[in-house]
């Protein structure tokens, strides 16, 4: 909805279809990997290989979810993938209880504003009991969002031979369509994507 709301087209598929090669990611400028509240394995070894190959060709990857970092840290292969390929690392488990995210000083000033995500049961979206705190794992990676209650990082971006954006909370749990559209538009600007391009949207 956020991509459509900002005027971009997209194609939706399952993680399995992407990992098994049913969908060819190389024809799309972005993969938006929605992890939600998924637990281990967060990103399977097969999917890791697919994403590694995609990024090696200069791709753009957005990943959001509550457990990408915390559930990857107990497995050496998963942790290496997150640190060396996605360019992020775990700062803290259970990083926020208030459900508020603020932008912070970074080279990407257009990623700005305050965002809120759902922490209580509601009829619209699942509630978030815990989220990951994140840190950059590369000199070319930067923190773009923080949880104001403790200043722990909530989101990072990496810009090198490819680009990644990692959020320690589920993007879809943001409270309002306006918040989702605003943040998505900023992320797509970071990825330098034009509206005529297709977006690969992974659910």
Q: What are the language-model segments listed below?
A:
Residues 24-26, 44-47, 67, 77, ...:
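Generic preference for flexible, low-structure residues
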Residues 1-30, 34, 72-73, 162, ...:
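Aromatic-Pro/Gly-enriched surface loop or interdomain linker
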Residues 14-16, 33-38, 64-67, 147, ...:
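Structural motif
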Residues 28, 32, 80-83, 98-99, ...:
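Residue-level marker of intrinsically disordered, low-complexity segments enriched
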Residues 37-123, 141, 149:
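A glycine-rich, often tryptophan-bearing local segment used as a flexible ligand/cofactor-contacting loop or short
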Residues 1, 48-52, 82, 132, ...:
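Short amphipathic alpha-helical segments and helix-helix/interface helices
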């Amino acid at each position: 909805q956020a991509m459509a709301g900002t005027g971009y087209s997209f194609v939706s598929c399952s993680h399995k279809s992407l990992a098994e090669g049913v969908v060819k990611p190389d024809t799309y400028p972005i993969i938006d990997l929605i992890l939600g509240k998924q637990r281990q394995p967060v990103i399977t070894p097969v999917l890791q290989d697919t994403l590694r190959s995609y990024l090696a060709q200069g791709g753009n990857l957005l990943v959001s979810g509550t457990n990408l970092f915390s559930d990857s840290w107990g497995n050496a292969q998963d942790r290496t993938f997150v640190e060396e390929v996605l360019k992020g690392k775990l700062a803290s488990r259970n990083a926020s209880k208030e459900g508020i995210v603020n932008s912070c000083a970074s080279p990407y000033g257009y990623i700005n504003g305050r965002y809120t995500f759902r922490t209580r049961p509601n009829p619209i979206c699942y509630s978030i009991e815990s989220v990951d705190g994140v840190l950059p794992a590369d000199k070319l990676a930067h923190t773009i969002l923080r949880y104001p209650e403790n200043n722990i990082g909530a989101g990072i971006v990496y810009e090198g031979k490819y680009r990644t954006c990692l959020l320690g909370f589920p993007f879809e749990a943001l409270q309002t369509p306006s918040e989702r559209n605003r943040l998505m538009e900023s992320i797509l600007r970071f990825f330098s994507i034009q509206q005529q391009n297709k977006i690969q949207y992974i659910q």
